[in-house]
């Protein structure tokens, strides 16, 4: 075995989350999967666009994360692409997330799904929703940074 660690390979990202929310704190969570789900994840059949995390009975659950079943994977099992999946977190992390979610305006969303060794991990975040004017300001800042880089590139060419 190699002594060098390979960077975790990203399976899916929730790009809409960075546009719609202000990220406050990130957590790494394991996820409970069935065999056909792992096979579909290896094929890249994951969508995390409208997914979110809920805490129920002291456990974290991932909702609306679509894992599309492969046609060749276990045909004898009825596959539910939008099933809720359990997230594996420490008790202190769950309590911290639960305390923040109960406050008005806070939510918990998944940011990305990636491989860490042979296991699938989900990066979740405590987030606060952006208002329309915040989104516009963020877009203006991004456009100005891009324009500034273009101007510097032309000036020093």
Curated annotation (Swiss-Prot):
It comes from the Bacteria. Residues 135-157 have a biased composition (Basic and acidic residues). Its main location: cytoplasm. Keywords: Cytoplasm, RNA-binding. Residues 132-157 are annotated as: Disordered. The keyword Plastid does not apply. The keyword Cytoplasm applies. GO terms for cellular component: cytosol. It is found in: Cytoplasm. GO terms for biological process: trans-translation. GO terms for molecular function: RNA binding. Transmembrane segments: none annotated. HAMAP family: SmpB. Belongs to the SmpB family. Required for rescue of stalled ribosomes mediated by trans-translation. Binds to transfer-messenger RNA (tmRNA), required for stable association of tmRNA with ribosomes. tmRNA and SmpB together mimic tRNA shape, replacing the anticodon stem-loop with SmpB. tmRNA is encoded by the ssrA gene; the 2 termini fold to resemble tRNA(Ala) and it encodes a 'tag peptide', a short internal open reading frame. During trans-translation Ala-aminoacylated tmRNA acts like a tRNA, entering the A-site of stalled ribosomes, displacing the stalled mRNA. This is SsrA-binding protein. It comes from Francisella tularensis subsp. holarctica (strain LVS). The lineage of its organism: Bacteria, Pseudomonadati, Pseudomonadota, Gammaproteobacteria, Thiotrichales. The gene is smpB.
